[in-house]
Amino acid sequence: MEWFTQSDERITLRLHVQPGAKKTEVAGLYGDCLKVRLAAPPVDGKANDCLMRALSDWFSVPLRQVSLKSGETSRRKVVEISGSNKNPQELLSG
């Protein structure tokens, strides 16, 4: 199973997040997910906010076009991004 699906202008990502890291960055693949380290603690939604802002920046879309579909309180998350023509594979190349 691939860590992302892409159709028209929608990208769906399967993520494994690691909150409380030194900096927010892509850390490679983790099974069938993209691993993302987050420089925010997993309290009061701070890690989710950090993730949404990072994805908004990485995919060059407004924050309102990034939505958390599942995994609000889990390390495994599914996120949908609309309106980006960026290839998700580019996240792995830095």
Question: Model segments located where?
Answer:
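Contiguous, often N-terminal, cationic amphipathic patches that form binding interfaces
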Residues: 1-45, 49-52, 61-63, 67-72, ...
